[in-house]
Amino acid sequence: MYSSPLCLTQDEFHPFIEALLPHVRAFAYTWFNLQARKRKYFKKHEKRMSKDEERAVKDELLGEKPEVKQKWASRLLAKLRKDIRPECREDFVLSITGKKAPGCVLSNPDQKGKMRRIDCLRQADKVWRLDLVMVILFKGIPLESTDGERLVKAAQCGHPVLCVQPHHIGVAVKELDLYLAYFVRERDAEQSGSPRTGMGSDQEDSKPITLDTTDFQESFVTSGVFSVTELIQVSRTPVVTGTGPNFSLGELQGHLAYDLNPASTGLRRTLPSTSSSGSKRHKSGSMEEDVDTSPGGDYYTSPSSPTSSSRNWTEDMEGGISSPVKKTEMDKSPFNSPSPQDSPRLSSFTQHHRPVIAVHSGIARSPHPSSALHFPTTSILPQTASTYFPHTAIRYPPHLNPQDPLKDLVSLACDPASQQPGPLNGSGQLKMPSHCLSAQMLAPPPPGLPRLALPPATKPATTSEGGATSPTSPSYSPPDTSPANRSFVGLGPRDPAGIYQAQSWYLG
């Protein structure tokens, strides 16, 4: 399901995933993979792992690269999103992020109407109940795949059979668990030298209790390789911060569209350029990250775009200034992944004048890839304007066009029969009917091709200072027209209108 790069890109960059990723515990990656390693070892050798082997696997998983853990968490969150009913996804995100009181989150049932089970690793033969996965992911509780009967739904849960809300799921503590907890607390109290507190009433605390360590060791055998302190520490560490060196919190905040710090809305996402997954994210382009559709047909617009960097999840779900775009249309855009050889003008345009598309090419070319990019918190585009052209994947805000809005850019108001190119003049210039072309629609051709000639008008066209001339009536230029009388659409690299006209060439 996730073997194709397209599917990976769509799933890993969904706003649903980016909002929940900071709340996933790093322990979940270690725990799920450790269980899979132990199971694989037992099937291969027909015996259980030794303590030393299991401890080595645990240390290896704990020291895994952060981008690997985040990629795994993104895939798992994508699976969970598809198993949650579309009408419950927004409430689920808001409740996990603390923006809304927890409510029931219903999952899609299996064929028998019960809780579904999913595999949490690629090509894994073990399946886990959805509610078990939720508790491990967002609470960091070390549960086995057979511990589904230990889960208890809260009293306020109205759908205990299909609800996967972590705040509605608790773990039943048996007498054996309480008994073991007593010995753990006693041992911690002895090691720290502090008196034991909170074990009962004051009268019970005043009585001396002797701890028979020998009897405890004879009755119980520790099967795990986590110590109490280590288990609590790793189970409380988020997957986005439970990492080694070269992965600071600032980079993580820049990577996430939903920042850990709500006030820092100007940070853009970055990833270390040394990781393979990071290069894939840059290479895959940023346009398929911004928008995705749910099975119900709803569009989600990523707040990583400049127009929505200051909007919350609810505004993204309701829709804002930037209209959603299909990925098939985005891939046609020549600005999807600019190469390092792009001109400075193109780079500056893609970083400052794209209304919907978030660009990562600047990050890849940055001399300091480990530092997060800072952008102004205010939106580049006017927040009140909504007159984008809806006919194509790339929409331009009104402030990029100093002239009047284009009437119909995609059809050009031309009859197909009248779009046949005219004869070539002596200089090899191609003549086009002036009723099909205007200075606002024309743009410089790609390098290596002759420039299009703009036929002069029969009447002198009025020209505003800094604006482009527009012919008033159709006419043709004879082949012997002198070069001084020919008008060409050629703009200097510093002309601000050149940026806009360079775009219209790709929309033709």
Swiss-Prot record:
Signal peptide as annotated in the record: none
Originating species: Homo sapiens (Human)
Post-translational modification Asymmetric dimethylarginine, affected residues: 365, 395
Motif 9aaTAD: where in chain: 404-412
Subunit structure: Binds DNA as a homodimer.
Originating gene: NFIC
Protein purpose: Recognizes and binds the palindromic sequence 5'-TTGGCNNNNNGCCAA-3' present in viral and cellular promoters and in the origin of replication of adenovirus type 2. These proteins are individually capable of activating transcription and replication.
DNA-binding residues (ranges): 1-195
Superkingdom of origin: Eukaryota
Record text about domains: The 9aaTAD motif is a transactivation domain present in a large number of yeast and animal transcription factors.
Localization per Swiss-Prot or TrEMBL: Nucleus
Pfam families attached to this UniProt entry: CTF_NFI, MH1, NfI_DNAbd_pre-N
Protein name: Nuclear factor 1 C-type
GO cellular component: chromatin; fibrillar center; nucleoplasm; nucleus
Biased composition (Polar residues): 334-348
Family recorded in the similarity comment: Belongs to the CTF/NF-I family.
Residue numbers carrying Phosphotyrosine: 300
Sequence segments annotated as region (Disordered): 190-209, 267-348, 438-495
